[in-house]
Amino acid sequence: MASMQDLKRRMESITVTHKITKAMKMLSTVKLNRFKATLGKTKEFYQEFYEVIGAVITNYNKTKPRTTTPTNQSTKRLWIVINTQLGLCGSYNTNVGKLLVSELAKDDEIILVGTKLNSFLRTRNHEDQIIHTYSINDKNIDFESSYMIGKHVLELHEKNQYDSIDCVYTNYINSLNFEAKKIQLIPADPSIFQADTLDRINDKFPKNISFEPGVDVIIPALEKQLLQVILYGCLIESKVCEYASRRNAMDTAAKNADDLYNKYKLLYNQLRQAKITQEINEIVAGAAK
């Protein structure tokens, strides 16, 4: 059994750790609220943009099968994987990594947005498939940054290297629940448009749309714009999930620190009481002689 001195030292250490986790929880809460506000401000734009793009893409898919596979008939895919720059966010990165690995083929290539997933992929022998890693922080999460990433992705796609471009990100459900998801960016997948969006599209736009100068020009151009917009949305939504996950992890850590402190405090008091009782017994025994 640990001595009173050891228990006291452990309690002091736990107190310091509790202060750190509490401070990190408060910081994560502030950043979570900031990114949630940013996500909320962009929803109106996304809704209108999705409706316009969705009207064209869904109409095109009804009248003509997709023919956007590269001319070299490559089956290689490019994955844009949004993870974190820092740790201490629970199973956030692990869930993203597991989804990626479950879908990843041998010839696929990966662009990481965030550096934390490097070690996960390295231990699973996928490190050679990483062609670029973007280091991100909270200050450079804006549309300009996502535009530069998207521009790089589109330049790679112009070389006709990929059959499709997919993004793995984390979908925000609520402050306690979020899940890793994948979304196909190019060729644009009509399934990304939710049922309510499709209903609004059918009400607002004609069912038969004429394409000028032609679908071979319009559809690729719209898909590039859609990639840029969705990528920015995925970055912001993933950031919301990151800080929600980190806040939850720090909250759990703080509660565990409280429980552990109380456990050691109880043991400390028991040892202290036992020591006092022993000293009293020795005094009584000595006085009786």
UniProtKB/Swiss-Prot annotation:
Q: Which domain of life is it from?
A: Bacteria
Biological process annotations from GO:
proton motive force-driven plasma membrane ATP synthesis
Asked if the Swiss-Prot or TrEMBL record annotates the protein with the keyword Membrane, the reply is yes
The function of this protein is: Produces ATP from ADP in the presence of a proton gradient across the membrane. The gamma chain is believed to be important in regulating ATPase activity and the flow of protons through the CF(0) complex.
Which HAMAP family does this one have? ATP_synth_gamma_bact (MF_00815)
Q: Which NCBIfam families match?
A: ATPsyn_F1gamma (TIGR01146)
- Per its record, how is this protein called by name? ATP synthase gamma chain
Annotated organism of origin: Mycoplasmoides gallisepticum (strain R(low / passage 15 / clone 2))
